[in-house]
């Protein structure tokens, strides 16, 4: 966590990661996006990457991963709003899981 004297309106972080499907036991590659409204502190990029890398080799469904990552971000920076989106493809089907917490953020156009 990094303390900031001036908070931006919204922070959006994106990266890729891997986990293991608990059903098929195959490697699941995913793209993850985290959006949050900071409240005096922001998540260090290295800390975010470490959070995502913690799923490598771990058996977890994407639905659980999205909620787990949301809880980690909330614990780290206590944002009033956070949204985690996990995207992947499995047997030709695009899977997108969203976990949100807090009030509705302002609309960005």
UniProtKB/Swiss-Prot annotation:
Residues reported in the UniProt entry to bind substrate: 28, 43-46, 62-63
Give the annotated active site: 21, 28
Q: What is its EC number?
A: 2.6.1.-
Write down the chemical reaction(s) this protein catalyses.
Answer: 7-cyano-7-carbaguanosine(15) in tRNA + NH4(+) = archaeosine(15) in tRNA
A Pfam family cross-referenced in the UniProt record is QueF
Recorded metabolic or biological pathway in which this protein acts: tRNA modification; archaeosine-tRNA biosynthesis
Q: What GO annotations for molecular function exist for this entry?
A: preQ1 synthase activity; transferase activity
> Which enzyme type, at the first EC level?
transferase
GO BP, one annotated term: tRNA processing
Record carries keyword Transferase:
yes
Under InterPro entries, the record lists: GTP-CH-I_C/QueF, NADPH_dep_7-cyano-7-deazaG_red, QueF
| UniProt entry keywords in alphabetical sequence | Transferase, tRNA processing
Output the superkingdom of the source species: Archaea
Q: Which family does it belong to?
A: Belongs to the archaeosine synthase type 2 family.
Family matches, as PANTHER family: NADPH-DEPENDENT 7-CYANO-7-DEAZAGUANINE REDUCTASE
Self-association or partners: how does it assemble? Answer: Forms a symmetric tunnel-fold (T-fold) homodecamer of two head-to-head facing pentameric subunits, with 10 active sites at the intermonomer interfaces.
Stated role: Is responsible for the final step in the biosynthesis of archaeosine, a modified nucleoside present in the dihydrouridine loop (D-loop) of archaeal tRNA. Catalyzes the conversion of 7-cyano-7-deazaguanine (preQ0)-modified tRNA to archaeosine-tRNA, transforming a nitrile group to a formamidine group. Can use neither glutamine nor asparagine as amino donor in vitro, is only able to utilize free ammonium. However, the enzyme might function in vivo with a partner that serves to generate ammonium.
What's the protein called, per UniProt? Archaeosine synthase
**What organism, scientifically named, is this protein from?**
Pyrobaculum calidifontis (strain DSM 21063 / JCM 11548 / VA1)
Gene for this chain: queF-L
């Amino acid at each position: 966590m990094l303390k900031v004297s001036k908070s931006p309106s919204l922070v959006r972080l994106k990266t890729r990661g891997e986990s293991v499907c608990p059903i098929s036991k195959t490697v699941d590659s995913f793209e993850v996006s985290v959006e949050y409204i900071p409240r005096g502190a922001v998540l260090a990029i290295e800390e975010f990457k470490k959070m995502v890398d913690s799923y490598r080799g771990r058996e977890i469904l994407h639905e659980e991963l999205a909620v787990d990552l949301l809880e980690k971000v909330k614990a780290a920076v206590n944002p009033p709003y956070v949204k985690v989106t996990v995207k992947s493809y499995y047997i030709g089907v695009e899977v997108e899981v969203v976990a949100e917490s807090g009030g509705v953020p302002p609309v960005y156009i």
